[in-house]
Amino acid sequence: MVNIGTHVSSSKSLDLVFERGKEVEASSIQFFIRSPRSWAWIERTDEEKERFLQKKNEYKIHPLVVHASYLFNLASFEEELYKKSIESVIQELKLCEELKIDYYVIHAGKSKGNPKKQAIDRILRAFEEIFSRLNLKNTTFLVETLAGQSGEVGATLEEVYTLIEPFENEKIGVCLDTCHIFASGYQINTDEGFNSFKKELIDYNLLEKTKVIHCNDSKAPFNSKKDRHEHIGKGFIGLEGFRIFLNDDDFNKLPFILETPKEGDMDRVNINLLKSLIK
């Protein structure tokens, strides 16, 4: 059985993510542990953490994935933002460890017009500091593939490899996003394009490092460098692209987590549609 889940709200109390996942029949869930568009940090009470861990055992939804705030930029050339991003990532990862979260997914950073090589060097220094200050035991740090807008680092598999290769002894891996890789120039919705993408993933030794797939169609066309998520089958990737992924013997062992627009009962609709594509 392929594991298909979705991103859920963690508003009001973190432990409510389990009920919200169950409501849409999600096998796995992803959520934020702070507002994705605010630097504000809420200290969680011991009672809230205990409720979360109790429900984790009760609901058996697995894996649990936390997505980093969108405000972080570990490639920033603005020193204040750079340091604030590092400290905030560490803050989030400490809570992930306490809550026994399986995976922490992050957009590594944006160069925003600055030289890409220097941006990569700044991300590597940030990663080095993060890993030197934490001893991750429960949570694996995942670098997400990105679409390439605003000088995003991680829009090619070569860049992703460059970011994680120096830390092979750490708990680090990859999160593939179908919308992002399609928008960045990998034509994953044809057999030829998918096979070419998978070969490159293997060549960079990233297939075995891939732990989570963000399952999103794309509102923007192939190679657009635009990050615009769409409901499954309603975008430029189309059903065939997801059918190929879901029936691949390597990828169908991984969790497929939706990040599609939150509209009515569309999470349940998208989950059931993905299930229908499995042979």
From Swiss-Prot:
GO terms for biological process: base-excision repair. SUPFAM superfamilies: Xylose isomerase-like. InterPro entries: AP_endonuc_2, AP_endonuc_F2_Zn_BS, Xyl_isomerase-like_sf, Xyl_isomerase-like_TIM-brl. It catalyses: Endonucleolytic cleavage to 5'-phosphooligonucleotide end-products. Keywords: DNA damage, DNA repair, Endonuclease, Hydrolase, Metal-binding, Nuclease, Zinc. Zn(2+) 2 binds at residues 144, 177, 214, 259. Gene3D superfamilies: Divalent-metal-dependent TIM barrel enzymes. Zn(2+) 1 binds at residues 67, 107, 144. Its EC number is 3.1.21.2. Zn(2+) 3 binds at residues 180, 227, 229. Binds 3 Zn(2+) ions. It holds the Pfam family AP_endonuc_2. Belongs to the AP endonuclease 2 family. Endonuclease IV plays a role in DNA repair. It cleaves phosphodiester bonds at apurinic or apyrimidinic (AP) sites, generating a 3'-hydroxyl group and a 5'-terminal sugar phosphate. This is Probable endonuclease 4.
